[in-house]
Design a protein with these regions (language model features):
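C-terminal hydrophobic structural anchor segments
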Residues: 323-380
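Short, charged/polar surface micro-motifs in flexible loops or helix N-caps
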Residues: 10, 33-35, 294-297, 349-353
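DNA-contacting surface of Y-family translesion DNA polymerases
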Residues: 182, 192-338
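Gly/Gly-Pro- and Ser/Thr-rich, intrinsically disordered tail segments characteristic of DNA damage-repair
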Residues: 1-226, 364-419
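Short, hydrophobic beta-strand segments
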Residues: 104-108, 306-312, 354-358
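Short Gly/Ser/Thr- and Asp/Glu-enriched loop/turn motifs at secondary-structure junctions
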Residues: 98-102, 139-142, 282-286, 337-341
Length: 419
């Protein structure tokens, strides 16, 4: 049996743990730079606030309904996630952390009753130890566990956060009530294909011939069909899958037209992306830089410029990556235009252990030692204690986060004081 554990409205729940007066109130969490809504409490969902809603467009709705607004505090959310996952790992050894708020479990050697009991114990313990509410779906396959979790979350008064698809009747009922677009692994393109032949529910999908599914949705689609039929084709992934590309992008608080300001932004993004690259012990050999206008302007005032270039050598050095990124920026920059967003994407990733030395390598060992020293200082004293020359030395541009909560669990001077 497989279980899918999902933290309910995770970001909003994290804020409520340390501010219990928020219970029952609508909450929205905003993206980087306080741009768009990326998470909502159930109360906010009930107000019709959609995911991705531009914050400025919903300002009056927020005010009228007394919506509590928070800037995204990923330091807090990441730490709370680690605590939740640590608790879960005490119950079952076979754990796959799927995302910041989701994990799969495999119950090998458990009877059905034992697995049910263990799931309910996890819900109770996570709530008691962290204050985070979780829902669990249990089923014979990972794909069905996802659907079982959906049932558990949709009917909390009946399920109390736990639902098990443990027989054929429950499986068929759940598949009959879920649309193809809501099935994990279907995707937008496949949903369109299925809709074109009047396949709109999970039941419709599993009734398709295997040959059609394999031909039109590849072997991956066929595996999904088998999963929904109750035959496991996906197992717990215990090894960490490294990212195939790394991006750092931001919208600006106000439009930027100066090349100097854009260089500072791209350099800072390069430093952040390079650090992510080193954290997963990878190197890149391709870089894409883009700049674009405000998407809410008139059509004739919208523009997007991007350029991708190949490095002469693989690297994870902030110095080399930022230098190359700035060169790309200068090629796409246009005067007399204003820009609202910029970003850098690192591609062509490979393990740093596979590095092949070439004539183009520039004191590679010296740069590795330098990057290691910078990372050590950053980890100990915070980001940007050591900066590149093209980063602003008087101030480092920071995201607009006017509604940021405290780092209750990671900063000693921000912990709650009990009087």
């Amino acid at each position: 049996m497989f279980a899918l554990i999902d933290c309910n409205n995770f970001y909003a729940s994290c804020e409520r743990v340390f501010q219990p007066h928020l219970n029952g109130k609508p909450i929205v969490i905003l993206s980087n730079n306080d741009g768009c809504v990326i998470a909502r409490s159930n109360e906010a969902k009930a107000l019709g606030i959609p995911m991705g809603a531009p914050a400025f467009k919903f300002k009056q709705i927020f005010k009228k309904n007394k919506v509590e607004i928070f800037s995204s505090n990923f330091t807090l959310y990441g730490d709370m996630s680690n605590r939740v996952m640590s608790i879960i790992s005490r119950f079952v050894p076979d754990l796959e952390i799927y995302s910041i708020d989701e994990a799969f479990l495999r119950f090998n050697g458990f009877t059905e009753d034992e697995a049910d009991k263990k799931c309910k114990e996890i819900i109770s313990t996570v709530w008691k130890w962290t204050g985070i509410p979780v829902s669990i779906g249990l089923a014979p396959t990972k794909s069905l566990a996802k659907i079982a979790n959906r049932v558990a979350k949709k009917n909390p008064d009946i399920t109390e956060g736990f639902y098990s698809i443990n027989n054929n009747k429950k499986r068929l009922k759940a598949l009959g009530e879920i649309s193809t677009g809501d099935i994990w692994g279907i995707g937008i393109q496949n949903e369109k294909k299925l809709s074109n032949i009047n396949v709109n529910s999970g039941i419709d999908f599993i009734n398709l011939p295997d040959q059609w599914v394999k031909k039109n949705m590849s072997i991956i689609g066929l595996k999904l069909k088998k999963e929904l039929e109750g035959s496991p084709t996906l197992d717990i992934e215990e090894t960490k899958v490294e990212k195939k590309s790394i991006a750092t992008t931001r919208s600006f608080e106000s439009d930027i037209s100066s090349l100097e300001d854009l260089i500072e932004r791209i350099t800072t993004y390069s430093v952040v992306a390079s650090k992510k690259l080193r954290n997963q012990k990878s190197e890149c050999n391709m870089i894409c830089v883009f700049i674009r206008s405000n998407p809410f302007k008139n059509n004739n005032e919208r523009y997007h410029y991007s350029l991708t270039g190949s490095l002469p050598f693989s690297t994870n050095s902030s110095i080399e990556i930022s230098k190359f990124a700035v060169k790309l920026l200068k090629k796409i920059y246009s005067k007399n235009k204003s820009y609202k967003k910029a970003g850098i994407i690192l591609m062509g990733l490979s393990p740093e252990s596979n590095h092949q030395f070439s004539l183009f390598d520039r004191d590679i060992e010296k740069q590795k030692k330098l990057m290691k020293s910078i990372d050590t200082i950053d980890n100990k004293y915070g980001l940007y204690k050591v900066r590149l020359a093209s980063q602003d030395q008087k101030r480092i541009w920071k995201m607009k986060r006017q509604k940021l909560s405290r780092n209750y669990t990671t900063e000693i001077d921000e912990i709650l004081i009990v009087k």
